[in-house]
């Protein structure tokens, strides 16, 4: 596990979405660009050049910086400088048991797939296996908003080992079969490349850069499809009103968009990236640097786009403002049951009965 809370990439995404465009970012590996393939060190925002590690202003647009200047952040973050974000034990325990139930059942179903069924899905598209949310760990607190954190937990021996084994095996099955799951994040460098979407979009090679104005969003697997709509300005057909975790629940994935080990169960947001290990890493934010005035605009834009409830559920009390203030103060973040009361019920977060599937997205959904 890498990063659970928003990191440099995700801050770039947030600002891209808030300002409906792509901002220039700087990485030591790639220099200035509008792509987000490398860890960003600086970005241009609101007429200022901002350090992505402390959100302090380090220069202006007129002075195009060629490297991250020395400032009070002095950002050459070392691994030993990372801050551990610890999750409450019972939160982790409930989550891991839910995950184990999910991956074990999906693995068993994939094992039962016949070669004929696999060939049919490869040729015609569609769903290969489906797992209904209601089949996942009926005793988990994540099943119902009325469940209690103190409810009895099933004892599972070698829980971490089993989780790792099942998840790894499931990934291998999916990759070896060239299938697309709708429940986990994939490396955006190959997520849609060459995938048959049907219609005019068949075999379209999509850009590897993030574009908030596009109907296709990187870093997550699309898990719902609607009608194709043709945009002459784009020169291709695309899916209108795509439902993606990035747009619906915020992008709280892993750093560098690496594959998450957190599936999206039904329409439940995968915001607990660190739950499978009980902790995650985040960059330390150094006090004393000039704060980014744009943060307030950004918070307002994100709250408007996603809704306060979703933000609070994802980041805990205080939402994004609270997260920003806590990290700027370098305070250890402990997620407790009280911080996770915003369970995504059917009213706020859609139908939890939504199935999770593996198959070809040509007619998936």
Swiss-Prot record:
Keyword RNA-binding recorded: yes
Keywords of this entry: Capsid protein, Host cytoplasm, Host nucleus, Host-virus interaction, Inhibition of host innate immune response by virus, Inhibition of host interferon signaling pathway by virus, Inhibition of host PKR by virus, Interferon antiviral system evasion, Metal-binding, Outer capsid protein, RNA-binding, Transcription, Transcription regulation, Translation regulation, Viral immunoevasion, Virion, Zinc, Zinc-finger
GO biological process: regulation of translation; symbiont-mediated suppression of host innate immune response; symbiont-mediated suppression of host PKR/eIFalpha signaling; symbiont-mediated suppression of host type I interferon-mediated signaling pathway; viral life cycle
GO molecular function terms listed in the Swiss-Prot or TrEMBL record: protein serine/threonine kinase inhibitor activity; RNA binding; structural molecule activity; zinc ion binding
Record localization: Virion; Host cytoplasm; Host nucleus
Membrane-crossing segments per the record: none
Post-translational modification: Cleaved during virus the endosomal proteolytic disassembly of the outer capsid.
Family: Belongs to the orthoreovirus sigma-3 protein family.
Assembly behavior: Heterohexamer of three sigma-3 and three Mu-1 proteins. The RNA-binding form is probably a homodimer.
Designated name of the protein: Outer capsid protein sigma-3
GN (gene name): S4
